[in-house]
Swiss-Prot record:
The gene is CLMP1. Signal peptide: none annotated. It comes from Arabidopsis thaliana. Required for plastid separation and partitioning during cell division. Not involved in plastid constriction or in the organization of cytoplasmic actin cables. Contributes to polar growth of root hairs. PROSITE patterns: PB1, TPR_REGION. PANTHER family: PROTEIN CLMP1. This is Protein CLMP1.
Length: 751
């Protein structure tokens, strides 16, 4: 983009006002375009407009937490603005805000950016606030106090500055007066008035102040100039005596800042003494106008109020105070079209206020001269990610102040009210101190001043940053997250995800498996029967006990089936389900015997079906286990297998003894021994099931019971049972009851 050799375009037939840059296009760029011979420097206006666009892009990136991108946009915008332009302060302040969000925080860079912002625009509120925080963070409390004093001098109700001031008072000790030293931003005003700067090196001799110079009262605040229509930033002037010296501490404490009314050119304000101040003319008193609010939070409707032209940050605080339980919310208003519009900035909040005022003007029989319309706001709960990110302060050139009603009063009334306000403030401070000293919790937190001073001196001398470990922790977590992000997106991570998924699947199935085991154990409860009672009572008790145990077995079956639905190859669940079917069949047979009814008329189909189901599940579980065991053995034999370590750890947990030290690796021989033990348990359980079935079939006179008995004996032998134990079991079979009573030991007849 090149310039045309300094050639200027002239505006034919238009006045100077039409040739100036529109303020809405530059969003508060205070300097108009340079006018040369009735023309406008369009190149400068284009640069300023482009700088504003870059600032908006930087704000969007800041809201998206892309702080590096926002820094670049602000830097590019600074390059387009002349060095003497006051709007450079906004860009430098925004860069400082980005630097304070980037971990670890480079406080020296933050201080440098804020200092450049104050160089372009002295007294810039946001730059002073951020520089004060940076000074506080690096332990330069004296410099932080100076910036806080300027903030509190221009706005005594500044919330953030008040909080920092309290912390600095604690850090500097109870005897440190925050008002004792001027701030760097006030150096220019003090030097211009000839006042020496105390506490900042050697004092220069004061210069005489001309009578035609500025003779504002103590702490006066300049108001908007009505002649040019531009709003100038309020500038706080340090108290000055008639001799040019600064007002003493005791005198300055009795002064309350009051805005001066627009006086004609001939009027002057003079100081009549060092201890009292007289004001010539009339003084305007500030009274904040409040706008009524109606909050709609689900079914909860509450009333509230906010200052007219309130900032969005203050509105968020009001909502939080009215609804303490709310966390992340959206604040919406209804526009003129009846749509709910979300408020995300102060500019949009002003639109909402305008919409409320428009509704007020449409209402008849309403005094519209001094009325403020009620604003209806809808508060909606959202997730923290959806809540609009609240900037530390909205980046606009001129900070909007609440609308102030002007009440004309006499000078004597103003001064008397000043004294009353000061006395009330002193009394309130004394009451707060008294109440805080009476609090027992506060007493417990008190510490000796010398200890705190020594710690502060030690930290300042050594240069220890108390928050360094927090910054390092956050930096480490960020690096860990970046490394993890690169790892999880690689191809090598997918097998690990599959393995983790299988582990969680097994854990979930194991939970249902254990849940079912609880019901199986509960079913073993011994329920006493009153044999002395009548037959009907005993029968009822028996029926109740049968139903209760049956219900426990049914619940166990449901849990085992859920475990198998989660992990179909969960052989433990299949074995447990077979055990449940076997116990259910035994329950049917035991209930039949307890009733002492004729067996010949009983239908055994349901009981035999349960035995068949148990045997089928036992067979399927055995085959499933054999396949898994074969695969595990292959993994152990293969030295290059990735699963060798995993299988070894699992075997170590299963076969470890608390008194003996288990080796770190399990050999193939040890794994084979453990597999043999598991196989023996399966055979033993299978043999018991076949033995019980043979007894039921023998009792009901069904053919084939001896075949099941022989199969049971074979299973016992495969399980490794001794011959004596097997002979004892066969002897107790129901088919040998007659032989057992006679005392003769007979073999089981062959089928």
């Amino acid at each position: 983009m090149g310039k045309s050799g300094g050639r200027k375009k002239k505006s034919g037939g238009s006045n100077s006002n039409s040739s100036q840059v529109n303020s809405s296009e530059t969003s508060g760029l205070s300097k108009p375009s340079t006018i040369v011979n009735g023309g406008v420097d369009f190149d400068a206006s284009i640069f300023l407009k482009r700088a504003h666009e870059l600032k908006e892009e930087g704000n969007k990136k800041f809201q998206a937490r892309d702080y590096v991108g926002a820094l670049e946009q602000y830097e590019n915008g600074i390059k387009l603005i002349p060095k003497s332009h006051p709007d450079r302060a906004v860009f430098h302040s925004n860069r400082a805000a980005c630097l304070m969000q980037m971990k670890p925080i480079d406080y020296e860079s933050v201080i440098s950016e804020c200092s450049m912002a104050l160089k372009s625009q002295p007294g810039f509120t946001r730059a002073l606030l951020r520089r004060a925080r940076a000074f506080e963070a690096v332990g330069k409390f004296d410099l932080a106090v100076q910036d806080v004093n300027v903030l509190l001098g221009s706005d005594p109700n500044h919330k953030d500055a008040g909080e920092i001031s309290k912390r600095l008072k604690t850090a500097l000790g109870p005897h440190q007066d925050l008002q004792s030293r001027p701030s760097p931003a006030a150096l220019g005003a003090s030097a211009a008035l000839g006042g020496p700067i105390a506490g900042l090196g050697p004092c220069l001799p004061s210069r005489n102040v001309h009578k035609k110079g500025v003779t504002s009262p103590v702490g006066s605040v300049s108001l908007p100039n009505a002649s040019n229509g531009k709003v100038e930033r309020p500038q706080v002037v340090n108290p000055v005596t008639e001799n040019g010296g600064s007002v003493s501490k005791g005198q300055a404490s009795r002064v309350v800042l009051k805005p001066v009314s627009h006086s004609p050119k001939g009027s002057k304000v003079e100081e009549l003494g060092s201890s009292s101040v007289a004001v010539v003319g009339k003084v305007q008193e500030k009274r904040i106008r409040w706008r009524p609010l109606k909050f709609v939070y689900d079914h909860d409707i509450r009333l509230g109020q906010m200052p007219v032209n309130c900032r969005f940050k203050e509105l968020r605080e009001i909502v939080s105070s009215r609804f303490p339980s709310s966390k992340a919310v959206l604040i919406k208003y209804k526009d003129n079209d009846g749509d709910l519009v979300t408020i995300t900035s102060t500019a949009e909040l002003k639109l909402a206020e305008s919409a409320a005022d428009c509704i007020l003007t449409k209402e008849p029989d309403t005094d519209k001269s001094d009325s403020v319309g009620m604003l209806r706001l809808h508060v909606v709960d959202v997730s923290p990610e959806q809540e609009p990110m609240l900037l530390e302060e909205e980046e606009e050139e001129v900070e909007e102040k609440p609308v102030i009603e002007e009440v004309i009063s006499s000078p004597t009334e103003s001064l008397s009210e000043t004294e009353i306000n000061t006395e009330k403030t002193d009394k309130e401070v004394e009451k707060e101190k008294a109440s805080s000293s009476e609090d027992p919790e506060t007493k417990e937190l008190e510490m000796d001043d010398w200890l705190f001073d020594f710690a502060h001196l030690f930290r300042t001398h050594v240069g220890i940053d108390p928050d360094a470990h927090i910054d390092l922790h956050e930096l480490g977590m960020e690096l860990c997250s970046e490394a993890l992000e690169e790892t999880v997106t690689s191809e090598k991570a997918q097998p690990l995800f599959d393995k983790a998924s299988a582990k969680f699947q097994e854990v979930a199935a194991l939970a249902f498996f254990n849940w079912g085991n609880v019901h199986m154990c509960a079913a073993r409860k011994r329920i006493p029967l009153d044999e002395s009672a009548g037959k009907e009572v005993v029968a009822a008790q028996l029926q109740t006990a049968y139903e209760w145990v049956k219900e426990r077995y049914t619940l166990a079956k449901e849990k085992y089936e859920q475990a198998l639905s989660i992990k179909p190859d969960f052989y433990e669940g299949l074995l447990a389900l077979g055990q449940q079917q076997f116990e259910m069949a035994k329950l049917h047979w035991s209930y039949l015997l307890a009733q002492k009814i004729d067996i010949s008329g009983w239908d055994p189909s349901e009981t035999l079906n349960l035995f068949d189901s148990a045997e089928a599940k036992m067979k399927d579980a055995t085959e499933m286990w054999e396949k898994l065991e074969e695969q595990r053995m292959d993994d152990l034999k293969n030295p290059n297998s990735n699963k060798k370590e995993e299988v070894s750890k699992r075997r170590k947990k299963q076969g470890g003894d608390g008194n003996e030290e288990v080796s770190e690796t399990i050999t193939a021989e040890e794994a084979a021994e453990q597999a043999t033990a598991m196989r023996s348990q399966i055979h033993l359980f299978w043999g018991n099931m076949l033995f019980e079935r043979s007894q039921v079939e023998c009792k009901i006179g069904k053919d084939g019971w001896n075949k099941n008995l022989d199969s049971a004996v074979e299973r016992f032998k495969l399980a490794g049972a001794s011959e004596a134990d097997i002979a004892t079991v066969v002897k107790n079979h129901c088919s040998n009851e007659a032989a057992a009573t006679e005392g003769d030991e007979k073999k089981v007849p062959a089928p």
